């Protein structure tokens, strides 16, 4: 299923059983049979999460997919999930040229 971002996890009787997602204007409720795997990328494009977990890297120009905003991490934490090794961020160091802000 493409272009269908999850918006929140579905909690039932002490466990995550699915996700609420959106495809265009349609809201979908997708129930999992055996579990939910959150494979949502990193969070280097979330200023909030970068400041929280790795303040030294928060001011570095991020590299990678601009969709890496930590949405999956935030959804899991909303239900009490713990996180590990968030200070280890894979990064390609670079810089912006003054006349070329997208460089």
Regions of interest found by a model, annotated:
Residues 2-16:
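A conserved short coil-to-beta-strand element within the FAD-binding core of flavoproteins
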Residues 1-2, 85:
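A generic structural-conservation signal
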Residues 23-101:
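Glycine-rich loop(s) and the adjacent beta-strand/alpha-helix scaffold that form part
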Residues 14-17, 98-103:
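Short low-complexity, flexible loop/linker segments enriched in glycine and/or proline
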């Amino acid at each position: 299923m493409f272009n269908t971002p999850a918006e929140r996890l579905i909690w039932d009787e002490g466990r995550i059983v699915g996700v609420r997602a959106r495809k265009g204007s349609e809201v979908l409720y997708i129930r999992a049979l055996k579990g939910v795997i959150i494979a949502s990328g990193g969070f280097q494009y979330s200023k909030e999460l970068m400041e929280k977990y790795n303040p030294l890297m928060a001011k570095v120009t991020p590299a990678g997919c601009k969709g890496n905003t930590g949405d999956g991490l935030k959804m899991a934490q909303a239900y009490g999930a713990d996180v590990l090794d968030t200070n280890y961020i894979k990064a390609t160091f670079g810089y912006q040229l003054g006349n070329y802000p997208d460089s």
